[in-house]
C-alpha cells in the first residue's frame, strides 16, 4: 500500500511561496485550496485504475481484473479492458485538439467577413501554410486564408471512409506510403474520434490489436492535423513567434492594476483581451486602478508569450502553468479569470465564492461552475473580450478593499528570452547552420520536452527541470512546449545566463548567439510544429545524402516527463505513430495488460519506428535519451 503523502515538493520558490500563502488562507477559509493541498489526502490510489484493469461501462460493473477474476462479467480480459480504456482516453484527447482546430479555422475563415475583426498578421506564414497544404499560394491574402480554412474544416468533417487530405498534405510522401501499406491513413478527424467511442462502448469491439491500431490513427490526427493546424493558423492571425525578451513569474501580478488571468489553449478566442484592455484603460483608472494587465497562464499564456513581440503592452507576461493557477488566484490580486479550454480547474469556483474573483467562460467546454458564459464567435470576438474586461474592472472595484487583508504580493519574477519558432530561428541563425552544428557534433541533437506538469511524478515542475538540465549538460539543445515552460521559466532556463549549465560546446553556441540552452517553442499545441520540424530535417538530410533517411534516424527525441491528462496521451500517440523516440513519466495506465505493454514497449519500432521509454528517474531518463541520440547519429554516420 502506498503511504500517505504529507506534502508535495516544489521545483522553485515561486510556486512554494504561493502555496504557503494559500495554506494560510485555507486555515481561515477551508474552500480555498490548491492542488498541492488536496493531493496528499488522495491516497491510497486504486491499483486497478493505475494499471488500467478497471471497467465501469455497464451496470454489471464495476469489474476489476485480478488473478482470481481474470475476466469481467462480459468475458473481457485485461488486454481488452486496458486497450479499450486507452483508446477512450486518446479519443478524448484528440477530440480536445480538434475542437481547438475547428475554432481556429472558423476565425481564419472570417478574415474575408467585413464584420469580423480578424486580420492577416503574417502573410509569409499564410503563403507557407498554403504551400504545405498544397493549395494555391498566389491569390489575395483573404482568399488564401478562406481556402485554407475551408480545406481544414471540410477535412475534419470528412467521413471516416474518406482519407484525410490534410494529413496527406502535411506528412512526407515516403511516410504516407508506409501508412497506406499498414492501413493507418486516418479519415476525417471527427469521424475517427466518433468511431473510437463506438468501438469502446459496451460489448462492441473486443480486439485489443484493432483498438491499438485505432490509437495510432488518432495519433496521426492529433499531430499533423490538429496541433499543426492550430499553431499554423495562430501564426497567420497573430504573427509568427519572434525572439524577444519578456518578464514573467508570479511577481508580474501588480496590486495597482486590474489583473485578468487566462486559462486555456485557444489564442483565437483570447487575443482580443489585450486590445480590450487597452481600449478600456480609462474605465479601469476611473475604478481606481492604474490600468489593466492580461496575465498569461496555462498554454494560452504560452501562446501569448511566444507572440509577445506582436502584442500591446497590456500583456504583462507569463505568470504560471496549469497547477499554479489556483495558487495565483490565492494571492488576492487576480480580479478575473477568463477561460476557454483546459487547464481550467474546477477548484476555481471557490475563488469566486470566497474571494469574489470574476469567472468568465468564452467557450462552454471550459465553463467553471458559477462562471458567466459569454460565448465567442468570430464576428463577436472584440465584443466578448470587452465584456470580459468590463466585468474584471467591476470586480476590481468591488473586491479589492473587501479582501485587502488577504492579499499577498509575490516576489518572484524573472526575465526570459522567448519567441523561438520555425521562422524566427531561420531568421536569427538559419536551420542549415543548426544542422551543420548537429552534423559537426557541437550540438549532439535536439530534445523536445513538452506537455503538462503534475504532482504525482516527483512534484510540481520538478522532473521537467531535472530532465532539461540532464540534456543540456550533454550538449543537447532543448525545445520546451507546453506547461513545462512554466517550470523552465521559474528555474531560469529561458535566460541566456543558463548557458553556464550546458556542456562546453552548447554553452559556447548559446553565448555566441545570446540565447538560452532551453528554447521556448510555444504551447503544447506547438508539438505539431516540432513534429513538422523533424519532417523538414529528415527531408533536408534525404536531399543532402541521397539516402532514405526516415524520422527515427533524425537525432531528435521527445519527452513528456510529467504527462497529466488525455490530451497528453494523444500527444504521445502522435509522436509514436510518427516514428519519434519518446520518453514518458509517470507510468501510463496500461501495465495490467501484457499485450498492450509489449506492443508499446517492444513492437512499435517495427511498426512505425516510434520508440517508447518509460522512466521515472530523470537522471536515468536523460542518460537513455542521450544514448538514443548517439545511436541515431551513428546510423547517419555523423
From Swiss-Prot:
Keyword Metal-binding appears in the UniProt entry: yes
Cofactor(s) demanded: [4Fe-4S] cluster; [Ni-4Fe-5S] cluster
GO MF entries: 4 iron, 4 sulfur cluster binding; anaerobic carbon-monoxide dehydrogenase activity; hydroxylamine reductase activity; nickel cation binding; peroxidase activity
Record's catalysed reaction(s): CO + 2 oxidized [2Fe-2S]-[ferredoxin] + H2O = 2 reduced [2Fe-2S]-[ferredoxin] + CO2 + 2 H(+)
Superkingdom of this protein's organism: Archaea
UniProt GO BP: generation of precursor metabolites and energy; response to hydrogen peroxide
EC code(s) of this entry: 1.2.7.4
Matching SUPFAM superfamilies: Prismane protein-like
Binding locations of [4Fe-4S] cluster 2: 55, 58, 63, 74
Broad class of enzyme this protein falls into: oxidoreductase
Binding residue positions for [Ni-4Fe-5S] cluster: 265, 299, 343, 452, 483, 524
A matching Pfam family: Prismane
Annotated cofactor note: Binds 3 [4Fe-4S] clusters per homodimer. Binds 2 [Ni-4Fe-5S] clusters per homodimer.
Gene3D superfamilies cross-referenced by the UniProt entry: 1.20.1270.30, 3.40.50.2030
Keywords in alphabetical order: 4Fe-4S, Iron, Iron-sulfur, Metal-binding, Nickel, Oxidoreductase
Residue sites binding [4Fe-4S] cluster 1 per the record: 46
Domain notes: Cluster B is an all-cysteinyl-liganded 4Fe-4S cluster; cluster C is a mixed Ni-Fe-S cluster which is the active site of CO oxidation. Cluster D is also an all-cysteinyl-liganded 4Fe-4S cluster that bridges the two subunits of the CODH dimer.
Family label: Belongs to the Ni-containing carbon monoxide dehydrogenase family.
Record text on subunit structure and interactions: Homodimer.
Protein name listed in UniProt: Carbon monoxide dehydrogenase
Organism taxonomic ancestry: Archaea, Methanobacteriati, Methanobacteriota, Methanomada group, Methanopyri
